[in-house]
Amino acid sequence: MSAKTILSSVVLVVLVAASAAANIGFDESNPIRMVSDGLREVEESVSQILGQSRHVLSFARFTHRYGKKYQNVEEMKLRFSIFKENLDLIRSTNKKGLSYKLGVNQFADLTWQEFQRTKLGAAQNCSATLKGSHKVTEAALPETKDWREDGIVSPVKDQGGCGSCWTFSTTGALEAAYHQAFGKGISLSEQQLVDCAGAFNNYGCNGGLPSQAFEYIKSNGGLDTEKAYPYTGKDETCKFSAENVGVQVLNSVNITLGAEDELKHAVGLVRPVSIAFEVIHSFRLYKSGVYTDSHCGSTPMDVNHAVLAVGYGVEDGVPYWLIKNSWGADWGDKGYFKMEMGKNMCGIATCASYPVVA
């Protein structure tokens, strides 16, 4: 074994051990600041392989913050190269004075193609919403709304490396509806939807739609609790048990395709609504503010990610939707993001629906 190989192996062991230490926040604006002995070890170890630069120190802080583990030096160098590209995108975007900011997160060492494979579902044609069934009334809408303040929104979850966003959007809507109807919280099974809802044009880790998931649950007689049917993030055989049902769906209500006025009425006066939109490459690095981008599409065949609209408001003069994601609480603004309202931005009102529970 060469001296270089021995050094590389030792460095990787130190990197992994130090990364398992205290969870330290990442501040890409000041990558040189050393805040713990564990971080100092990571910085020194990574620098031995990649050299000395601000990018290298930023990368070291990133690996420490997110507990990244690489198989060998070659993979570390590859991930560093990708990280540099993403860091440059973050910095160049944030200099433009836009209504939102990007930031380093757990996806900063992934290519766009890798991210697509693990986080996004295949585009779904949500034709069920061409003619909506939501009834708009004359009731006055609140100027702002945040269903979290009513205590009915369940905690942010993490879909992991499975394109099952549609299941988390579905359970998020059902958990909120259940809490609203019965005055208590519940956690429902995403894995049952991954494994069992295929007959309703859903594809497990390859994507699906909340509207179709609601129809499956209605036909099936219910959805099991998370405790009874826990999430694995893999396509498996169906293990539904009627005795473990946590909620039943009486009906589902669709928002007319692209009708943000209907969506605002539903979110403002009824409850959180399952929605879908097109994620493009910059969005995965969202950190704060109101996201907007003219490059994303808004047709039924563009949308590739399902989420949950839990409110709306105005920030610095820009109206927005408040949305719960399923990429963990470390992503974005504690697992949430804001999307510009009024332009069907990225198709935010293209595939919207909500359930009626029992």
From Swiss-Prot:
<keyword id="KW-1015">Disulfide bond</keyword>
<dbReference type="InterPro" id="IPR000169">
    <property type="entry name" value="Pept_cys_AS"/>
</dbReference>
<keyword id="KW-0645">Protease</keyword>
<dbReference type="GO" id="GO:0006508">
    <property type="term" value="P:proteolysis"/>
</dbReference>
<feature type="disulfide bond">
    <location>
        <begin position="196"/>
        <end position="238"/>
    </location>
</feature>
<keyword id="KW-0732">Signal</keyword>
<keyword id="KW-0926">Vacuole</keyword>
<keyword id="KW-0865">Zymogen</keyword>
<feature type="glycosylation site" description="N-linked (GlcNAc...) asparagine">
    <location>
        <position position="254"/>
    </location>
</feature>
<dbReference type="InterPro" id="IPR039417">
    <property type="entry name" value="Peptidase_C1A_papain-like"/>
</dbReference>
<feature type="propeptide" description="Activation peptide">
    <location>
        <begin position="22"/>
        <end position="140"/>
    </location>
</feature>
<comment type="function">
    <text>May play a role in proteolysis leading to mobilization of nitrogen during senescence and starvation.</text>
</comment>
<keyword id="KW-0788">Thiol protease</keyword>
<dbReference type="InterPro" id="IPR013201">
    <property type="entry name" value="Prot_inhib_I29"/>
</dbReference>
<dbReference type="InterPro" id="IPR025661">
    <property type="entry name" value="Pept_asp_AS"/>
</dbReference>
<feature type="disulfide bond">
    <location>
        <begin position="162"/>
        <end position="205"/>
    </location>
</feature>
<feature type="active site">
    <location>
        <position position="325"/>
    </location>
</feature>
<dbReference type="Pfam" id="PF08246">
    <property type="entry name" value="Inhibitor_I29"/>
</dbReference>
<dbReference type="InterPro" id="IPR025660">
    <property type="entry name" value="Pept_his_AS"/>
</dbReference>
<feature type="active site">
    <location>
        <position position="305"/>
    </location>
</feature>
<feature type="active site">
    <location>
        <position position="165"/>
    </location>
</feature>
<dbReference type="Pfam" id="PF00112">
    <property type="entry name" value="Peptidase_C1"/>
</dbReference>
<dbReference type="InterPro" id="IPR013128">
    <property type="entry name" value="Peptidase_C1A"/>
</dbReference>
<protein>
    <recommendedName>
        <fullName>Thiol protease aleurain</fullName>
        <ecNumber>3.4.22.16</ecNumber>
    </recommendedName>
</protein>
<comment type="subunit">
    <text>Interacts with VSR1/BP80B.</text>
</comment>
<dbReference type="InterPro" id="IPR000668">
    <property type="entry name" value="Peptidase_C1A_C"/>
</dbReference>
<keyword id="KW-0378">Hydrolase</keyword>
<dbReference type="InterPro" id="IPR038765">
    <property type="entry name" value="Papain-like_cys_pep_sf"/>
</dbReference>
<dbReference type="GO" id="GO:0004197">
    <property type="term" value="F:cysteine-type endopeptidase activity"/>
</dbReference>
<feature type="region of interest" description="Interaction with VSR1">
    <location>
        <begin position="22"/>
        <end position="42"/>
    </location>
</feature>
<dbReference type="GO" id="GO:0005773">
    <property type="term" value="C:vacuole"/>
</dbReference>
<feature type="signal peptide">
    <location>
        <begin position="1"/>
        <end position="21"/>
    </location>
</feature>
<feature type="disulfide bond">
    <location>
        <begin position="296"/>
        <end position="346"/>
    </location>
</feature>
<keyword id="KW-0325">Glycoprotein</keyword>
<feature type="glycosylation site" description="N-linked (GlcNAc...) asparagine">
    <location>
        <position position="125"/>
    </location>
</feature>
<comment type="similarity">
    <text>Belongs to the peptidase C1 family.</text>
</comment>
